[in-house]
């Protein structure tokens, strides 16, 4: 049976939108905002730390951040009445 690899999202800010194609070699591009010049890149869990250190050294990358999508609560039933304790800004 195929084992599922853990994946993590990286938010990569670019200087120019034309350089987004160069990042396709590092992982899967899920979303590209042309207005705000960033993209959401999915990579393997074991490669994420290495890429977070090495991608800002590229000339076309402005900043790299880890996505916090896995930390969000995805149980939406009754979420309007729940306390505001796990809010990520």
Swiss-Prot record:
This is UPF0298 protein SSA_1730. It is found in: Cytoplasm. Belongs to the UPF0298 family. Signal peptide: none annotated. GO terms for cellular component: cytoplasm. Its main location: cytoplasm. InterPro entries: DUF2129. Keywords: Cytoplasm. It comes from Streptococcus sanguinis (strain SK36).
């Amino acid at each position: 049976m195929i084992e599922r690899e853990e994946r993590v999202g990286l938010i990569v800010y670019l200087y120019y939108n034309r350089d987004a194609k160069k990042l396709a070699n590092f992982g899967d591009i899920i979303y590209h905002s042309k207005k705000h010049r960033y993209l959401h890149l999915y990579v393997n869990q074991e490669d994420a730390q290495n890429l977070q250190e090495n991608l800002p050294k590229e000339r076309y990358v402005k900043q790299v951040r880890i996505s916090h999508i896995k930390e969000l609560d995805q149980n939406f039933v009754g979420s309007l009445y729940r306390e505001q304790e796990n809010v990520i800004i």
